[in-house]
Amino acid sequence: MAKVYIITGPYGSGKTEFCIQLAKKIAGESSKKTVIADLDTVNLSFRSREKVEELMPLGIEVIGGHLDNNTAQDVPAVSFAFLSAMNQDKNLIIDLAGGRIGTNLLSHCYDYLKDAEYEFLCVLNSFRPDTQNAEKMVDFVRVISGAAKIKVTGLVSNGHMIHHTEKKHVTLCRKEVIKASEILQTKHYMTLIKKEFYEDLKNEINFSENVLIFDKLEMRKDYQ
């Protein structure tokens, strides 16, 4: 049976960035094949299926829309081929569209998920309008859980301002995510942090959660 990681979050949270970094980490640590199911048919600016050529040599398969596995496909079409991966011994990462649209889609997959070993993770960035503080984060997570018909099992802290990110963005967001996790009684699953910041912060912060350290952003070329 697959280990399933379902990733949601508001637009601009860095949800897809997290999916790719998580896939690279898992693929490097596990003997099982890792699959990313790119179900983001809404955000056309940055999608995990645009990284197919880079991820394949790492043993990471990307499942996109049903017409093709290419970046030219901008129609709102979803492949449900990823469901078969749940019956195989693979690591499956599901990259949902941001907000309620993605989680509404997930609700149709409930029968497949209920018996699976899964984590339903919400990526949060306190430097986005919908999730500026713990209270707004809590409201967002509750709406998402209701739409998906399954409970969010963990929160991911991803404080960033893309290429203008500083250490303070990481620490400030992390504090709000911790508060939100306490209110929701949900675990603070992970903090996503660039290597250069982690080296400075590891002596200042006692990271009780998992820490996903990355070297570079996997942004679209026209964003760099």
List each model region and its residues.
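Conserved catalytic-core segment of NTP-binding enzymes
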Residues: 100-206, 221
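The conserved Walker
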Residues: 11
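Walker A (P-loop) ATP-phosphate-binding motif of ABC ATPase nucleotide-binding domains
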Residues: 4
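Switch II (G3) loop of P-loop NTPases
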Residues: 65-70, 90-105
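Hydrophobic positions on the alpha1 helix immediately C-terminal to the Walker A/P-loop
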Residues: 18, 22
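Hydrophobic anchor at the beta1->P-loop junction of P-loop NTPases
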Residues: 7
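N-terminal phosphate/diphosphate-binding loop that engages ATP/GTP or pyrophosphate donors
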Residues: 25-74
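Conserved lysine of the Walker
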Residues: 15
